[in-house]
Regions:
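Iron-associated oxidoreductase/ferritin-like identity signal
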Residues: 1-169
Length: 169
């Protein structure tokens, strides 16, 4: 594997673990304000992000590459109203999408077709992640200002269950 590609994939592991930390911090915020459905949604999201990190880890391992773990930064975001984590999540998912796209461009440049194929799943996944984040913002804008609407949205989010990723390495 190209050394730069290996480096970028290692960096992505850290970014995915950071995503999990960020979403656990959001879950913690929502638990503190009594929105257990939002808490559940972000706990499930954190598990998905840990899975993404482990998929990159496993891919590097399967290809005989060294895995280097770096420190995971403390999540930083402005606490404010209940919308703040939702907006930060969309912003963050857009950064992750840009990161994966940059890896894909580097992989394409060196014609690493196996890694391109693996990254195809992540590119599709990021489209779903951005849509989910944007949809939550839309729902909160529509219903979050009304206590009954917020209750219903919270109940909907409480029903989310963890599903393991479909990517098999």
């Amino acid at each position: 594997m190209n050394a730069n590609v290996s480096k970028l994939l290692n960096e992505q592991i850290n970014k995915e673990f950071y995503s999990a930390y960020l979403y656990l911090d959001f879950a913690n915020y929502y638990a503190a304000v009594g929105l257990d459905g939002f808490e559940n949604w972000y706990r499930v999201q954190a598990q998905e992000e840990r899975d993404h990190a482990m998929l990159f880890y496993q891919y590097l391992q399967n290809n005989g590459e060294d895995v280097t773990f770096e420190a995971i930064a403390k999540p930083e975001w402005e606490r404010g109203d209940h919308m703040a984590p939702l907006k930060k999540a969309l912003e963050h998912e857009m950064l992750i999408t840009a990161s994966i796209n940059a890896i894909y461009a580097a992989v394409y440049e060196v014609r690493d077709f196996r890694t391109m194929q693996m990254l195809d799943w992540f590119i599709k996944e990021q489209g779903e992640e951005e849509k989910n984040a944007a949809d939550l913002i839309t729902k909160m804008e529509l219903f979050g200002g009304d206590s009954k609407g917020l209750y219903m949205l919270n109940s909907e989010l409480k029903a989310r269950v963890y599903t393991a990723p479909s990517l098999v390495l």
